[in-house]
């Protein structure tokens, strides 16, 4: 049972009391020091063993301390599961991580390749682990062909220009159309003038 020692602190609230004597302060300091050494069991002697190289309290065992772990890479965060198979088949180890699963599907490992199960379950290209390997190979090939076809078809996006370049583009097109109109009008006038002159020449 622990005994609590009351500290002899000088009271500063009462101004009419006289300050404590020096021997009372010394006795209070000795009591506090003894209590601190009893609580923490602070040793009075320190040694530096050769195998450790740092100072430790005298009497501590250095042989029973567990060895420090060797520095190395972090352990992998993957889950490894080995399935039991008959004697004619080799055991298969499946390693699944969260980073390999894409969005929208569940990654299932088969003998040939990995396929994705959709939520609806109406996709004919998905396979399970109990299906025939030939069926899974054909379905995986169809899945790959669909994926490659989807990757090859790219939609061409319309080119959008900034406002200032758009203004320049409209100006250039409008100036082109206006210049073409001017050329057409001039050619019409020249044709009309030449036909009028020709009619004047041919008239009696």
UniProtKB/Swiss-Prot annotation:
Chief place of localization: host cell
Keyword Hydrolase: no
GO cellular component terms, semicolon-separated: host cell nucleolus
Entry keywords, A to Z: Host nucleus
Signal peptide boundaries: none
Low complexity bias locations: 123-140
Note: The protein AAP uses an unusual ACG start codon.
Name of the protein described by the UniProt record: Assembly activating protein AAP
